[in-house]
From Swiss-Prot:
A motif (HXXXXD motif) lies at residues 92-97. This is Probable 1-acyl-sn-glycerol-3-phosphate acyltransferase. The gene is plsC. The lineage of its organism: Bacteria, Bacillati, Mycoplasmatota, Mycoplasmoidales, Mycoplasmoidaceae. It catalyses: a 1-acyl-sn-glycero-3-phosphate + an acyl-CoA = a 1,2-diacyl-sn-glycero-3-phosphate + CoA. One of its GO terms (biological process) is phosphatidic acid biosynthetic process. Converts lysophosphatidic acid (LPA) into phosphatidic acid by incorporating acyl moiety at the 2 position. GO terms for cellular component: membrane. Keywords: Acyltransferase, Lipid biosynthesis, Lipid metabolism, Phospholipid biosynthesis, Phospholipid metabolism, Transferase. Pathway: Phospholipid metabolism; CDP-diacylglycerol biosynthesis; CDP-diacylglycerol from sn-glycerol 3-phosphate: step 2/3. It comes from Mycoplasma genitalium (strain ATCC 33530 / DSM 19775 / NCTC 10195 / G37). One of its GO terms (molecular function) is 1-acylglycerol-3-phosphate O-acyltransferase activity. Its EC number is 2.3.1.51.
Length: 268
């Protein structure tokens, strides 16, 4: 009976959301255009656009997109997020994951602004301008010098008060397994001496993926409308500074995997 009630309630909510789309969608398009214009102006006049303005624009745009898609972001243990910058390390199941993290961080008072480390290939996408608006750091894995420069950029952003998120698996894992974590993704935490916040994202598997790609991997898209963001216990730098990065990566992977497994929806 409880499940039936939840299903019925969800149906009503989604129905009302769909009815509101003729109003919401044009506003979303206008907001998207405004973000693109702001991003272009930010490149030429960066000091005219402080982080609180730029990040807020992107947060609002992401919130509207999630509303349009009918996706609800649920956070667990969000009170442990500190006001100071952290390195967020999360699992990666879908292109939806960065948007979910933006939503989870952006709606919390006093949380630091959040940006991402992303692959250089994303520069060829329409999202590049939006990513630049929140100071995303792009990495070319084939260029050692560029990787070093990107690491310095990450440290600079942290000094300026921005939290950085990395998907340490390095790619989307289209299964319920958690992939191996790359220790290089944690280097900025060592260099900048900042806490690490392990985050488990549950319920995004297969979302924003083509049916062809899902079929190739034998994956069924999650039918759950909720995506859960679990903030695991903060790891302070004094506790990992002397630990080998490979061991630290394995420890963080275990933390994220345990929380993911315990919260994974049955239909994922």
């Amino acid at each position: 009976m409880d499940k039936l009630f939840k299903t019925s309630f969800r149906f009503i909510i989604r129905f009302l959301q769909i009815l509101s789309l003729p109003v919401v969608f044009p506003y979303f398009l206008l907001s998207f255009l405004a973000c693109l214009i702001t991003s272009k102006n930010y490149e030429s006049l960066p000091y005219n656009y402080p982080p609180e303005i730029r990040f807020k624009k992107v947060y609002r745009l992401v919130s509207m997109w999630l509303y349009i898609k009918g996706i609800k972001v649920v956070t667990v243990n969000d009170k442990i997020i500190p006001k100071k910058p952290v390195l967020v390390v999360a699992n990666h199941k879908s292109n939806l994951d960065p948007l979910v993290l933006i939503k989870a961080f952006g709606r919390l008072k006093n949380s630091p602004p959040l940006t991402f480390v992303a692959k250089i290939e994303l520069k060829d996408t329409v999202l590049f301008k939006l990513m630049k608006l929140i100071d995303c750091v792009f990495i070319d894995r084939k260029n050692i010098r560029q990787i070093a420069n990107a690491l310095e950029t990450q440290q600079q952003l942290i000094r300026q008060g921005t939290a950085i998120a990395v998907f340490a698996e390095g790619t989307r894992i289209l299964s319920n397994d958690i992939g191996e974590f790359k220790p290089g993704a944690l280097k900025v935490a060592y260099n900048a001496f900042v806490p690490i916040l392990p985050v488990s994202i549950v319920g995004s598997l297969g979302k924003m993926e083509s049916n062809k790609r899902l079929k190739e991997h034998g994956v069924k898209k999650s039918s759950n409308y909720e995506v859960k963001v679990i903030f695991n216990k903060l790891i302070n730098p004094i506790s990992f500074n002397q630990i080998d990065s490979n061991n630290l990566a394995n420890n963080i992977r275990s933390i994220i995997s345990d929380a993911y497994t315990s919260e994974k929806p049955s239909n994922d």
